[in-house]
């Protein structure tokens, strides 16, 4: 039975993610901060919620910045929400924070004056929104284009390499909702809260061989 490591650095909705993975039959799901267990896992999930400064402080304290770079190179890897944002070069949040740098680009604030067709939009962007599939990818299998997923975020990803953007969202402006590079895939939305389509994405991740 394959092992899925859900990385625990104290800043994630870990049990919901683990429960959803178990629900789709992903295998043996372990919530862990043990580097040895993470290195030996067949698949890696990197969730996250909260302020990016706190997240990055814990990630660096535990040595997960280099570990994540290492283990994501040769097996399926999934970043979720702030776990995705931590993979970028930097974030504007908390006055500016350097991140892991797995994906080139910056995490930016939606702003307090966000509008769509004359209507003021509340920040954070919270609730269901469509994701346009920019390219075909194994993790989109059996998920229709423009499917709705659940988002909660005040900061969005401005990707520097548009070829890595495999899903796009829109909330007053366009943003990267999903990024991919080799065996690495990351999403801004919460698949574990996104009902049928979110569970399908997790099921696809559990079956994915990491090639793209």
Swiss-Prot record:
EC number: 4.3.2.10, 3.5.1.2
HAMAP family (alphabetical): HisH (MF_00278)
Pathway stated in the Swiss-Prot or TrEMBL entry: Amino-acid biosynthesis; L-histidine biosynthesis; L-histidine from 5-phospho-alpha-D-ribose 1-diphosphate: step 5/9
Entry-linked SUPFAM superfamilies: Class I glutamine amidotransferase-like
Signal peptide: none
A single GO molecular function term of this UniProt record: lyase activity
Keyword Lyase: yes
Catalyzed chemical reaction(s): 5-[(5-phospho-1-deoxy-D-ribulos-1-ylimino)methylamino]-1-(5-phospho-beta-D-ribosyl)imidazole-4-carboxamide + L-glutamine = D-erythro-1-(imidazol-4-yl)glycerol 3-phosphate + 5-amino-1-(5-phospho-beta-D-ribosyl)imidazole-4-carboxamide + L-glutamate + H(+); L-glutamine + H2O = L-glutamate + NH4(+)
GO biological process terms, semicolon-separated: L-histidine biosynthetic process
Native source organism of the sequence: Pseudomonas syringae pv. syringae (strain B728a)
Name recorded for this polypeptide: Imidazole glycerol phosphate synthase subunit HisH
Function: IGPS catalyzes the conversion of PRFAR and glutamine to IGP, AICAR and glutamate. The HisH subunit catalyzes the hydrolysis of glutamine to glutamate and ammonia as part of the synthesis of IGP and AICAR. The resulting ammonia molecule is channeled to the active site of HisF.
Name of the encoding gene: hisH
Domain named Glutamine amidotransferase type-1: residues: 3-212
Binding partners and assembly: Heterodimer of HisH and HisF.
Keywords, in A-Z order: Amino-acid biosynthesis, Cytoplasm, Glutamine amidotransferase, Histidine biosynthesis, Hydrolase, Lyase
Matches recorded under Pfam families: GATase
Residue ranges of the TM segments: none
Localization, UniProt: Cytoplasm
Catalytic residues (positions): 81 (nucleophile), 190, 192
């Amino acid at each position: 039975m394959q092992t899925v490591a859900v990385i625990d650095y104290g800043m994630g909705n870990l049990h919901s993610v683990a429960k959803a993975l178990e629900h789709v039959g992903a295998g043996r799901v372990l919530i862990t901060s043990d580097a040895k267990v993470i290195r030996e896992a067949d698949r890696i999930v990197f969730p996250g919620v909260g302020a990016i400064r706190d997240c990055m402080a814990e990630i660096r304290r535990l040595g997960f910045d280099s570990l994540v770079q290492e283990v994501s190179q040769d097996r399926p890897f999934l970043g979720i929400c702030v776990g995705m944002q931590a993979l970028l070069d930097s974030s504007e949040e908390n006055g500016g924070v350097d991140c892991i740098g797995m994906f080139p680009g910056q995490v930016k604030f939606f702003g307090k004056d966000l509008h769509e067709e004359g209507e003021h939009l509340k920040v954070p962007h919270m609730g269901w929104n469509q994701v346009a599939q920019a390219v075909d990818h194994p993790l989109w299998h059996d998920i229709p284009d423009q499917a709705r997923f659940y988002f909660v975020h005040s900061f969005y990803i401005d990707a520097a390499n548009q070829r890595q953007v495999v899903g796009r969202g829109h909330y007053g402006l366009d943003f990267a909702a999903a990024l991919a590079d080799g065996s690495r895939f990351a999403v801004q939305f919460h698949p574990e809260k996104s009902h049928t389509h979110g569970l399908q994405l997790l099921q696809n991740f559990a079956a994915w061989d990491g090639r793209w």
